[in-house]
Amino acid sequence: YTLIDDSGYKNLESPITIKCSHGHLIKTTMKRFRRETFECPKCNNDIVVNPKVVPPKAAGATRVVAFDQATEHFGLSVFDNNKLVYYSLYTFKGTLDSRLVAITRMVRDIVIKEWRPDYICFEDIQYEKNIRTFKILAELIGIITELCKEAEIRYEIVMPNVWRRYANTAGKDRRTEKMLSVAKVKELYNIDVSDDVAEAILIGRYAVRRIGATTSLAFGY
């Protein structure tokens, strides 16, 4: 961001005008601008609703892909620089083995080969009382991790409480957290999505900020 006008500045509540990297002029206050979650509202409003395809990756763009992964419902989001350009829910059916094979092919042949991400971020496993579910999710993380390593793509496995703290969607239980995620995405982008997609979008937002906050991507691969 570039500061354009702070002539009336007296304190954190004073009005200022800044310009984002896309040239949008934003009137805000220093207090709002200093928040970790501050983003250009005009960029966020320029969102394609229910996009059917992932747009071609622009020259010089940093593409981030984020997952809220499970073997049946797989939320996914794509950001070019800090702009949300695609989001979708992939559904997999059949036996566990067939679902894992389908997910492997989707991540390898579509996400990695066609979309050409620079960075992939996905959620770490939450504690599960059901040991079978825990093992399945661990296997899924292992598959995605190996695909990232094989393609030499930088990645991050983020703990749920970390990205939720950034998104301000932590709740007393999982149901509340899902509702908060859907509401947060509606607030930010004015789109209606499922909780799986909402969480994939918020994980992507976290990853975009994570990349912007570090000069060297030393974590992950």
What is the predicted role of each segment?
Residues 52-221:
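Phosphate- and other anionic-substrate recognition elements at nucleic-acid/protein interfaces
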Residues 1-55:
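Functional cation/ligand-contacting sites centered on basic and imidazole/sulfhydryl donors
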